[in-house]
Curated annotation (Swiss-Prot):
HAMAP family: TrpD. Homodimer. This is Anthranilate phosphoribosyltransferase. GO terms for cellular component: cytosol. Mg(2+) 2 binds at residues 227-228. The keyword Transcription regulation does not apply. GO terms for molecular function: anthranilate phosphoribosyltransferase activity; magnesium ion binding. It catalyses: N-(5-phospho-beta-D-ribosyl)anthranilate + diphosphate = 5-phospho-alpha-D-ribose 1-diphosphate + anthranilate.
């Protein structure tokens, strides 16, 4: 192992970027629990200070996917809608809520998530409060995607090896490459993804990373401080289509909506969030809350080939108003 790891660590000390293969080798050793914690901290720090390249991120993601527990991958188009978290704004659980609304609009979603990073209640905390089984088997999860159109893959169940990095990450108390890997390592391996990132500087590099992860169609977004499509300002988008990246900006008007202040979509602790999300999914939320979810669903629908954002937004709002989106929450809770 030293023959593999020493040249990689030396390269990082010299602030040289790793090839995708070298990054994959490094993270393979980390995930198998074979790297000394001091060396791991050194490598993660060197990567952070240098700035992780798309090759390094893709290599790390491929190592984690190669070591993940298996999932029976659907042979149809299906998506993940996910944010890195860590934007520090504690909004309502937009992407989790949007997953149910997207399914009510006819899309297939296999959402990968974990406990909270930035909101007081992460997606798994919220699903837990609705009685959705986070420990559902891979087979049952796949069946839920087939039959209900939406299911949730809880990261620790598939990525046990990440625990080897936890003590180092907790001691370092700073963002590392692991903070951006979560959305790239969905064990179901979706071919469509809407991914929000906590910094505008990450939009292009993450899109370049996704290009190497053989996505059919994807978009990376940062919305005026949020790791989501914004309803309070502009959203920077890098979209992957036909193997090319197109960058553009979206505003609430592009979705046919009025802007709303960021304060209007603040979240709470899990119990409060449960009430807020129930209201949204039954059409009883505020215009800001419904809009915040609808714009994210609308962009995800575009990735499935429904290009008209305004029509998509209306369809998403209707799926909430009709209560159809909330029925899927109940179906998923009853599924296991």
């Amino acid at each position: 192992m030293e023959a593999i790891i020493n040249p990689i660590i030396t390269k990082l000390y010299e602030q040289e970027s790793l090839t995708q293969e070298e990054s994959q080798q490094l993270f393979d050793i980390i995930i198998r629990g074979e790297l000394d914690p001091i060396l791991m901290a050194s490598a993660l720090t060197a990567l952070k200070i240098k700035g992780e390249t798309p090759d390094e991120i893709a290599g790390a993601a491929k190592a984690l996917l190669a070591n993940a527990n298996p999932f029976p991958r659907p042979d149809y188009d299906f998506a993940d809608i996910v944010g890195t978290g860590g934007d520090g704004h504690n909004t309502i659980n937009i992407s989790t809520t949007a997953a149910f609304v997207a399914a009510a609009c006819g899309l297939k979603v296999a959402k990968h998530g974990n406990r909270s990073v930035s909101s007081k209640s992460g997606s798994s905390d919220l699903l837990d409060s609705f009685g959705i089984n986070l420990a559902m088997s891979a087979e049952d999860t796949r069946k839920a995607v087939d039959e209900i159109g939406v299911a949730f893959l809880f990261a620790p169940q598939y990525h046990g090896g990440v625990r080897h990095a936890m003590p180092v990450r907790q001691t370092m108390k700073t963002r590392t490459i692991f903070n951006i890997l979560g959305p790239l390592i969905n064990p179901a391996r979706p071919n469509i993804e809407l991914m929000g990132v906590y910094s505008e500087e990450l939009v292009r590099p993450i899109a370049e990373t996704m290009l190497q992860m053989s996505m059919k169609r994807a978009a990376v977004v940062h919305g005026s401080g949020l790791d989501e499509v914004a309803i309070h300002g502009e959203t920077t988008v890098a979209e992957i289509k036909d193997g090319k990246i197109t960058e553009y900006t979206l505003t609430p008007a592009d979705f046919g909506l009025e802007p709303h202040p960021l304060e209007a979509i603040k979240g709470g602790v899990p119990e409060e969030n449960k009430a807020i999300i129930t209201n949204i999914l039954t059409g009883k939320g505020t215009d800001a809350q419904l809009g915040a979810v609808a714009v994210n669903v609308a962009l995800l629908m575009r990735l499935f080939g429904h290009e008209d954002l305004k029509a998509n937004t209306q369809q998403a709002v209707e799926a909430m108003n009709s209560g159809e989106a909330y029925q899927l929450v109940q179906q998923l809770a009853a599924h296991a």
